[in-house]
C-alpha cells in the first residue's frame, strides 16, 4: 500500500534489499498506533487458504538461489544453503504482523486480504492474480516489491515469476464432453470475448498469440521490472 508507506515516511525506492525491508517494517511496527495500522505485514495465515503463499511461493526463493549458486536442477540435490534466509523473511512476517504469531494457525487468506484492503497493514505477499481482491485500494496505491531474503545481489532481483503448466480435463468423461471442454478452453484463449474476460475481468496474463493484453496494473509493474533488466 503506497499510501500507507508514504505516510510512514518511505517510498518503494527506500527498499532495495532485506535489510532495508526490515528497517522499514520494524519502524512501521513500532509506530503502528501512530500510523493507524495493526502491523507492517498482513497476517501470514497457516490454514489451507493461505499457507501455500509461504510453503511454496516463499520457499521458491531459497531454492532458486541454491539452484543458481550450485548449478543444480533437482530437488534431491538441495542442501538447504539458504534456509537461514528463508527463516529471516518468515520471522519478519510474523513479528511485524497484524496479529500475534500464536493466532496464525487459524488465520485465513481472506483475513489477510481484509487487513490489506482495510488499510491495517502496509505489505501483503501475493501475486498479480490477486488484483481483483485488492483493487478497491485504487490502482495508484498498489505497488509491488521483490521478496527480499538477504542474499548477495538481490538489489538486482525482480519479481518471482511462475505459472501453472496445464489445465486438466477429466478423461473419464464422455468423448463429447471432453471435446466440448477442449473447444471451450480454446475459445477462452483465442476469442475476443474469452480473452477479454480473462484479461479484463479476471486480470490474468494469457501467454497465447491471439490473446488480449491484460489491463491488470500489477502485471504492468511486473513487466516494468523485466524492462529494467531485473531478474524475474
Language model features by range: what are they?
Residues 8, 136-201:
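Extracytoplasmic/periplasmic substrate-recognition and gating elements
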Residues 16-22, 103-118:
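Short helix-initiation/N-cap motifs at beta->coil->alpha
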Residues 22-75, 121:
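Extracytoplasmic/periplasmic solute-binding protein
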